[in-house]
Design a protein with these regions (language model features):
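Conserved N-terminal phosphate-binding loop of PLP-dependent enzymes in the Aspartate aminotransferase
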Residues: 1-149
């Protein structure tokens, strides 16, 4: 189980989504749910993912920050740098970037947005346009505070 330790040296040994990772009951339930969905249900998460990623890029530009966002479909990840990210190891943050992301996460929590400490975000069918607007405003406000620190 050492490979699942939080850090090995200064890098995560194996990233893990957590509780539901490879759980056969969860996977079966997810598959059953997907069989009931219409094709448009699969298109909506892609659309809102694109909307969020483009919105984040606009916020970073507005704040004149050298941050970036990666992702596909309903997933996105914020990176407080402009290094090329091709693998999960490329996304590894140095200690200053970790502190920056922790501050960013706390500022978002103050604005009622839960965001992982390593910058990962996940969207779903229940995500509304109002939710996206709230997220992007919270990111803009939070980055204003973080940048001023």
């Amino acid at each position: 189980m050492d490979v699942f330790a939080a850090v090995k040296g200064n890098r995560a040994a194996v990233p893990s989504g957590g509780t539901f990772t490879a759980n056969p009951i969860t996977m079966t339930a997810g598959f059953a749910c997907m069989e009931q969905l219409h094709q448009s249900s699969f298109e909506r998460p892609d659309q809102i993912g694109t909307q969020v990623r483009e919105g984040l890029v606009a916020v970073f530009a507005k704040q004149s920050l050298d941050w970036q966002v990666t992702g596909a479909g309903s997933l996105f990840r914020v990176h407080p740098h402009q290094r090329v990210v091709n693998t999960y190891r490329d996304a590894h943050l140095d200690s200053d970037e970790v502190a920056l992301m922790e501050s960013f996460q706390h500022r978002l929590l103050e604005r009622e947005v839960y965001f992982s400490g390593y910058g990962m975000g996940c969207l779903n069918l229940a995500t509304s346009d109002n939710d996206i607007e709230h997220l992007l405003k919270a990111v803009d406000d939070a980055l204003g505070v973080v940048a001023a620190q």
